[in-house]
Amino acid sequence: QTLGVEPEVLVGICVERSVEMVVGLLGILKAGGAYVPLDPSYPNERLGYMLNDAGVKVLLTQNNLLPELPSHAAQIVCLDTDLKIIESHGQENLMTDVGADNLAYVIYTSGSTGQPKGVAIEHRSVVNFLNYMGYVPGLSQEDTFSAITTISFDIAALELYLPLIVGAKVIVTSHKIATDAN
């Protein structure tokens, strides 16, 4: 919030699959913002287009990815090297005016013209989807999810958040392991 993150403010997140990725996503939502998931394996031109098209104000990333990122106007926060600064902020719950009709995230599709197209997803849509999927097929604290999908694909919200809301376990699988055929 000290960086101006509030409802309808878009925050990019371009990180490798890790626990820090989940912390970053939850931090954006908890601050009241909406995230724009950016796969670090995307071509530089595509990432640049998405950052500019979305008007991303803040970009969460990791220090090792900085050389690969296109130039952009967003303020950068590295979840690894800026950890001390992040930890210096209060640990209390943040107050926000986020409602069901506010944006949760903007995900980019390939687009019918070949240019990526942003699709805005509201909190109500995410919550309704997760609540339904929690009941059918039915999940419990005894279940374990393997999150293998890139965060730039919409099913990632199911893989990451559903286990958390039902008290189950989520294992964030690295890109290397998730794509290994063996």
PLM feature spans:
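Carrier-protein-dependent adenylate-forming modules in NRPS/ANL systems
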Residues: 1-127, 131, 135-141, 145, ...
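Conserved adenylate-forming
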Residues: 147, 179-182
